[in-house]
Amino acid sequence: MHFSKDFDIIVVGGGHAGTEAALAAARMGQKTLLLTQNLDTLGQMSCNPSIGGIGKGHLVKEIDALGGAMAAATDEAGIQFRILNSSKGPAVRATRAQADRVLYRQAIRRRLEAQPDLLLLQSTVDDLLLNGDKITGVVTHLGMTFSARAVVLTVGTFLGGVAHVGHQNFQAGRAGDPASIRLAHRLREMNLSVGRLKTGTPPRIDARTIDFRILREQPGDEPVPVFSFLGNITQHPRQISCWMTRTNERTHEIIRTGLDRSPLYTGKIEGIGPRYCPSIEDKVVRFSERDAHTIFLEPEGLETSEIYPNGISTSLPFDVQVELVRSIAGLENAHITRPGYAIEYDYFDPRTLKKSLETKVIDGLFFAGQINGTTGYEEAAAQGLLAGLNASLKIKEQEPWCPSRDEAYIGVLVDDLVTRGVTEPYRMFTSRAEFRLQLREDNADMRLTETGYRLGLVSEERWQAFAAKREAIETEKTRLRNTWISPGTLSKLQTPDQPADDRSYSLYDLLRRPEIGYAELVSLSARGQSVIDSQVAQQVEIDVKYEGYIERQRQEVVRHAQHEAMILPKDMDYRAVRGLSNEVTQKLNQHQPETIGQAARISGITPAAISLLLVHLKRGMARQAVKREEMHESGKTVA
């Protein structure tokens, strides 16, 4: 049966990628249909109840700057907010929030149902309709066909999904939801390179059975941060604490004893899991020298007693899960409400995608999220927004858009995927970016909102707020440049042991000094109106203070390009290179690249690692030059 209404764009899947894709397409005026197996799980947080973190928070801010929903929904659902790396430089500071699962789903659904040009339908997609190598629509499990000019697949872990608990396994997209088996078979028939990946989740624990008295409390930050550039703290629900505990040697012995029934260690699971979110059994085996691992006990919401024990993801048998949980301090009497499990699923080599996230082999078919080999809500949402945007641009017969690596972490993410591919689930880190000093959380709107407005992603309300903020920043910078401080006034900031300074300085020049912040600066001068808005004040201070560093980083990237063809020694032992992570060392020793350029294109090799390689090579060349000179001098002496 053919559905009478034709659509411009159909989005398949209602997770973080699918909801952002559907909202983006509809915001751009496309008649959009979002198909999902269950309308009650739109925006579901399938694993951890948190948004943001290092690299991930940057993506959330960029999604927000382009008009996306994730940041605003988190502000309405966040029950604890923290700034990670707050003592470090602004490039690596990152917002992270614990979210109430129910409130987050509700916030996303409100936005979907309020969005013009967007319809929702609960139905499972089993097949794709093609005319030659062009997508024309989809077919559901009820035999209903829907026509569209573009289709965005955001199917998460549902393609051929198999869940594992010990020796038991069953088909599932996640616990409680069926896998997409027919659609997986259909995609495998196409000229696409397919592989299997794996992820996992920990058992959930009833908070009423936890002894919090002996645990370490982890409260949120004060003042409470916000995620969205349009957000404020009045949107936040009640704030609560998380808690910390640790595994111990008894825990590890229980895990080691149970490995003979672990699907990870008995060959049942073939998919590769996320390196940076390993299961507890992986941690115990790979880091056998460690006698403890930290566990964060994270509330799943305000109206539930369930706790997410972040750090003990596992697919061990349920009886082993109970034993290992109860071996941990504070959890001796813990009741598990849901067992942990691992899940294997299909993904497709993202190198078969264009930067628009359209497949190269099927015209009008876009992929976003875990189908491309990524892991994480934030990575999925960023891809979804970009896929929805580019599907819309394609229908409008306009050029596709993807930010470059120096414009956004979204650009870094997509460039890494489509040029390097993945061998394991891809997670965003700030270390993956060459330009991270200018790709900060605080300036995501300055980098992207104007483009988003031009493309039709950004609302008039957001644009007006952005324009006012941008003007306020430039006005304040001008005031700082034109306001000069006399030596007498400057002495107020000096300590008794500092020598007297008889020169005058502009406030702009003073703000460049690492020991002087914007707040101290404002107290020096009553001339002109200082900034009240904290976002504007923060932006001004960072822009001024790091101006020189950003310029130097740009020059460093130019130098990297010049080193592209630098030859690496054959059979080089990368363990000798100081500062390289275990991951980077392992991959370089495995691939043995011939040049710096080849090394840079290996999946997982970061710009920071390339810098360390260059330093190592330069030191080696310097030592060789000294030896040659010594030999030359020695030869002259003998003669």
Curated annotation (Swiss-Prot):
Stored InterPro entries: FAD/NAD-bd_sf (IPR036188), GIDA_C_N (IPR049312), MnmG (IPR004416), MnmG-rel (IPR002218), MnmG-rel_CS (IPR020595), MnmG_C (IPR026904), MnmG_C_subdom (IPR047001), MnmG_C_subdom_sf (IPR044920)
Residues given in the record as NAD(+) binding sites: 273-287
Keyword terms: Cytoplasm, FAD, Flavoprotein, NAD, tRNA processing
Keyword Flavoprotein recorded: yes
A Pfam entry, by short name: SAM_GIDA_C
GO biological process: tRNA methylation; tRNA wobble uridine modification
Compartments, record wording: Cytoplasm
PROSITE patterns (UniProt xref): GIDA_1, GIDA_2
Family label: Belongs to the MnmG family.
Subunit field text: Homodimer. Heterotetramer of two MnmE and two MnmG subunits.
Protein name (Swiss-Prot/TrEMBL): tRNA uridine 5-carboxymethylaminomethyl modification enzyme MnmG
Native source organism of the sequence: Nitrosomonas europaea (strain ATCC 19718 / CIP 103999 / KCTC 2705 / NBRC 14298)
